[in-house]
Amino acid sequence: MSTAKKPLLEVRDLKQHFPITSGALLQKQVGAIRAVDGISFDVYPGETLGIVGESGCGKSTTVRSIAQLYKPTSGSVVFDGIDLVKADQKTMLKARRDIQMIFQDPYASLDPRMTVRSIIAEPLVIYNNRKLLDKPLSALDIERKVENLMERVGLNKAFKNRYP
């Protein structure tokens, strides 16, 4: 990727370790599970990142750590210029509007009763209804955003009324 473009997402030396404890009452840490141990990568505007690997290798933990659903043990996650590891709750809520995760099983992630358009529009509609967007979106605004997102990831707009 050209160095002239700035990454949209920068992950540096991300680590997510979970403590192993012994004893029921006075729990003492006796070790740690190193679920994610020092990964780094960049994602540039227009790119899509797929994380693949064996079951239990840390794919979901990596994504949850990036989205700050788990507080990383160490490392940095910078999304659109915002250091998510150091972000306050309000900043994190705003950043999560732009972060999308689709986990391993597409049949569990994508509702087969919803059209592609409805699936893509769902977060926009929820945030719009809860008045969490900077400005309210009309139905036409949402439709345009759905088509723009489909175009950005290489999905033909003709698929928007199909089911996954």
Regions found by a protein language model. Name each.
Residues M1-A32:
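ABC-family P-loop ATPase nucleotide-binding domain
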Residues G46, Y70-V78:
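Conserved post-Walker A/P-loop segment of ABC ATPase nucleotide-binding domains
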Residues V52-G53:
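The feature captures the beta-strand-to-loop junction immediately N-terminal to the Walker
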Residues A67:
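Helix-to-loop junction immediately C-terminal to a conserved catalytic motif
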Residues G75-D83, A95:
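Conserved ABC transporter NBD signature motif
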Residues D83, N128, L137-F159:
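Conserved ABC ATPase "signature" region
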Residues Y107, R113-I126, E143, E147:
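Short helical segment in ABC ATPase nucleotide-binding domains corresponding to the A-loop/adjacent helical element
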